[in-house]
Every structure is written in structure tokens, then in C-alpha cells.
Amino acid sequence: MTEPLRLGVIGLSTKGWASTHLVPPLLGPPLSSHYKLLAVSTTNPTSAEASAAKYSTANTTVKAYHTPESIASDPDLDIVAVSVKTPNHVENATKVIEAGKDLFIEWPAGRGLKETKLLAGLAKAKGIRTIVGLQARQSALFRKVKKLVEEGKIGDVLSTSMTSRIPGPHAPWGPTVFKGSEYLLKKDNGATLLDIPGGHFFEAFTYILGPIDTISATAVVQHASSQVVNPDGTPTGEVIPVDSPSQVAVSGTLKSGAVISLHWRAGLETPSNVKAATPLLWVIDGTKGSIRIESDHPLAALVEMYEPTQLWVNGEEVKVEDDGKTNEGRAWEEYLKGEGAGDHADLQHAVKIKSIIDAIWRSAKGGVKVSL
């Protein structure tokens, strides 16, 4: 048996995304015998010590750091994961790359196409392996759909349409925002409705249907300001300006010639349990039939986290077996297969997804059709 990969995580505190989604699959079987968490880093020494204490075991003492340089230079680590807010991606990931460590980085892997290209170039020049938190392709349902399309179950794809919604109250990109999430409402921070839900969807979309050819887009800011609220929903009294769109609509064509129509909606108040307000509905029409993907989960627009479970093919419901794994866990499993063997996103692939998003921004800003 090979030795487990020695892992450090930047941004792993006692709560938050890394502690609830990224790391848990690594702490139990089957992955716990292949990965070993040895170090954490946060900007606050106190929180770093608390996190290290939480993840230490009887056999392993997790080290606490509070700078990216210190954890990246730890000789006892093979790979370092960066799980911090988007504006801090480049600063932290660059330190890991410079130290010659393999890198996991959360999507969107930097602000805009320029920063993602920068990281991809640095990683390639250094010769390190990378894995990016674009996990939607790991979904058992999406893999099933990909197989159905490739096997010609619905014939040649003619068109595809998707609508998704993120309901209130206090969800991102709406009239109110939880304290600590204000950065999502500034477009230049690279964590918009298009960057996050959109980017993850395009990962599944292109994985199943192939590359996009042309795009025409509309992005609208319908809430010029947002009221900041506490975790319990009470207002803090602060109101911040918003330049991040709450509505993004995209039409265009695939390289195959199929027509696409996609619409992301946020800041909505219609209850998520109202059928007319289905959080995710994706239809793929072909010459021999259609595929319908649906989810009633309130946050189904975040396809990387909340896998759709309802699938119909030519009007018949198809059940997809639940293996009990998460998309994050499946991605970590793929990484173990080695360079070029595992089916997971890396920084070079992230550039391709970011190029789609960049084309949408350019189309929406200029009111023009953009070719990819």
C-alpha cells in the first residue's frame, strides 16, 4: 500500500465550507487511508490553533500556521488545499505553487479569467499537479446523463434549456445579505451569480454536451443595494451598494449546432416549495426524445453541492443509485488515480470554464454575440 498523501489546508477553521464539505470526506473510509491531514492555516493564530486541536487525533498532531508561506514551506506536506474567499485565491495559491507543492484550489480559482490563467501558467511552469473544486462532473446523475447522451438515447441533441433560482430570504445576490458575505455583491471580487452557480453549472453542462460555440448574454443588477443582516436575520443597520447581477440570461449555440438557453435568477421571494418556482429545471431535447433533470432543493442552483436527484428520459423516470458519496469525495478519489488518469478538473480546465464566463461578461457588457 502506498503512503497516504500528506495534506495541509489553508482556510480550514472549526466552521465554514472547508470544514463542512471539503475535508469531511477525507476523514473517514475509504479516503482516510489515502490522505492524512497534517496542517492547517488561518489568518488568525487563535483560530488556527483551535482548528488544529479539532482535527488532531490520538495518532496525529495537526500543526497550526497563520500565513500561507509557512504552511506552504512545510516539508512534511505533499499537497496544500486553498479554501479561502475568492479575492485571496491568488495570494495563497501562489505561495503553494512557489514552494513546489501540489495544489487544490476552490472554484473559481481567482478573480476573472486573468487570475485563473496566471495560476495555471505558474503551476505548469513549476510542474506541479493541480485539482480545482469544480465537482459537478462527479455527480452520479450527471454521469448517467452524459452516458445516455453519448449512447444516443435521445438521438442528436437539438437544443437545451435550463432555469435555476436562488430564493430568499438573505440568500446571496439579493436585497439582503448575511454579514461576512458582502464580498459576493461586488463584481470585481469574482464571486458573482455567474461565477459561482454559473461556473459550476458550465462544468456539468460542457462535460455532458461538449464545447460552446457562440454566446449572447444579458446580466442585470436588479438590487442596487443590499441590507446586511446578522445570522438570525436581524438588520445590522448597514446597507451596501451592489454591482453584481441578480439575473443572468444566456443564449447561443454549441459546437455541435445545438441551441442553448440558460437563465440564473437570484433575490427572489417566492417560496421554494411552490412548484412554479422549481429551483432547477434542465431539459435536453434530441431527435429521438428528451432528458429532463429537476430538483426541488432550495439551493439546487448550486449543482456542485446539491446534486439533482430527479431524472426523466423520454417521459420515464430513471432512478440513479446513491453510492453515499459526496461530489467532493469522488473528486478526491479521482485525484488519487494519478496525473492524467483521474477524471477531475485542474487549473488548465478551469481556464476553459472561465473563458465561457468571460465571454458572457463581454457579451452582456457590449450587447454583442461572442464566439468562443
Where on the chain are the PLM-derived regions?
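C-terminal helix-rich "cap/oligomerization" subdomain common to oxidoreductases
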Residues: T2-P4, S32, S56, I79-A81, ...
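Residues that mark the start of a beta-strand
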Residues: P4-G8, D156-S159, S290
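Core-facing hydrophobic residues within beta-strands of well-ordered domains
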Residues: Y35-L37, N59, L77, V157, ...
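Short acidic low-complexity segments
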Residues: K63-S73
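Predominantly a Rossmann-like dinucleotide-binding segment in NAD(P)-dependent oxidoreductases
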Residues: G16, A136-P241, G367
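Contiguous beta-strand/loop segments that form the cofactor/metal-binding neighborhood of enzyme cores
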Residues: I196-A300, W332-A341
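Beta-strand-loop-alpha-helix segment that lines the small-molecule cofactor/substrate pocket
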Residues: I79, K85-Q138, G152
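N-terminal Rossmann-like dinucleotide-binding module
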Residues: M1-A58
